[in-house]
Amino acid sequence: MKTIAVNSFKGGTAKTSTTLHLGAALAQYHKARVLLIDFDAQANLTAGLGLDPDCYDSLAVVLQGEKNIEEVIRPIDSSGLDLIPADTWLERVEVSGSLAADRYSHERLKIILSKIEHRYDYVIIDTPPSLCWLTESALIAAQHALICATPEFYSVKGLERLATFIQGISSRHPLNILGVTLSFWNYRGKNNAAFTELIQKTFPGKLLNTRIRRDITISEAAIHGKPVFSTAPSARASEDYLKLTEELLFLLRNI
């Protein structure tokens, strides 16, 4: 089982859309068994797959020892895609209950996921856009980190702090940076070269070749609670996310 934490230090980087479509592509087009984990209290991944966050338990109850992980997994479709939803309790889970007194609380998610490693080929975790307890726990539990950015100044500058954060974790836990993916891409953007150069300096050799172009069909798919492969299979967003999935699979197979 390969576990991937999808990260950014700033909102609006298509982190959740990337998580959703990577998982959906692996399940639908590569026949993989995929578990998506919404580890962000905003619960956008949950809503983007058509579930109401107020109606389901999140990993919070599992982290607190109140339920087993199998009890919070929700099937999304018959392709092999499952989801653990998010809820607002995630935002404060580390300061309540049994986690509050556990000095090794960051390790719990890794231990929990080890119990289902026979069940899935991939676990993909959508982390909050901040350097918080949830993000650290996800990175400790993961073997790989996928970093999301946009060709904007604040997004690219935020990568420097994220790089320092990840470096601190990888010094204690094995963690491979799978790559940096750029979304909302415009091939005619006048500052493209400057942004890509800064990313290469921050994460040398990790900028992925695939660019996710801006496409309204992604937002339209979210309204319907489905991936864009289902609502607009011929859209450029579908093409881009399938290419991204192929590129990531190549990297995973050649590590």
UniProtKB/Swiss-Prot annotation:
Q: What PANTHER family does the record point to?
A: P-LOOP CONTAINING NUCLEOSIDE TRIPHOSPHATE HYDROLASE (PTHR13696), PARA FAMILY PROTEIN CT_582 (PTHR13696:SF52)
Family named by the database record: Belongs to the ParA family.
Q: What is this protein called?
A: ParA family protein CT_582
List the source organism. Chlamydia trachomatis serovar D (strain ATCC VR-885 / DSM 19411 / UW-3/Cx)
